[in-house]
Amino acid sequence: MVKVLSVHSFRGGTGKSNLSANLAVCLAMEGQRVAVFDTDLASPGVHVLFGFSAGDKDLLINDFLQNGKPIKSCVHDVTPSAVKAAKGRIWLAPASMESDKIAKILREGYEVERLNDAIFDLVEDLKLDYVVIDTHPGINEETLLSTAISDALVMVMRPDSQDYLGTAVAIEVAERLDVPQINLVVNKLPDCFEPDSVKQRVNDSFNYTPTAILPLSADLLNLASGGLAVLECPDHTWTQSVKDLASLLHAQVSNTQ
């Protein structure tokens, strides 16, 4: 049975999309069939990490939501060669970067229930093992409904006072939605921060121990979202931490019905 992972943050700039893409790769490197949905329609970006650039005839998730195009026509195979060699597959449902389409979706909205139904239709067509949803930051109806169908939630935050305040709200909402597994990930931890102190503060603030603490890395900054870190920097500490996170998530959702 397919498992749905939502990757969320209360604020933008946490590295949520980067983590979504790299988690998808880690799962696919284990031979899983994974689809990534970019539902951050106001500020899409996960497609950049996969090197996807929409052509004039390429259909995007906006075309499904507002123009009635079939969802299967709006997903694209973005499987890297290393993932193919590992017998995995990755599909991407990218969102439009065109300003008029972004403005239209913000102005008119969309039926989230319809998107949720389409995700599960696609599961059958592509025989998916995992769906990774890259959400829009903050708390809104669209995010709530996509989170509600998740088997596990990855809440991404930085060690920043505003993130602590906002993340508390987001976790409370997720708990009310009865998300089976809630995981806190601290990302972009500067070298000057002591990981154990951050872990303790997170635990004191939310009563959750961080599932992962990921470093702020100059190597990843140099990559500048121009590739997938787990493939470009396979021996990096950040990569190993994300692989460990993917393994933990796989174990969590494998135990859910």
Residue spans for each PLM region:
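Acidic-aromatic/histidine active-site loop/patch
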Residues: M1-V4, Q252-Q257
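Walker A/P-loop phosphate-binding motif and the immediately C-terminal alpha-helix
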Residues: V2-L41
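Short, well-ordered alpha-helices that flank and scaffold nucleotide-derived cofactor binding pockets
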Residues: V25-M29, V48, A148, E172
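Phosphate-binding loop that captures ATP/GTP phosphates
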Residues: R33-V34, A42-L92
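Conserved Rossmann-like nucleotide-cofactor binding loop
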Residues: A42, E98, Q162
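Cytosolic-facing regulatory segments adjacent to core modules
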Residues: K72-S73, S81, A86-P137
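Conserved catalytic-core segment of NTP-binding enzymes
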Residues: E113-L216, L221-N222
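C-terminal boundary of histidine-terminating zinc-finger modules
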Residues: S225-S241
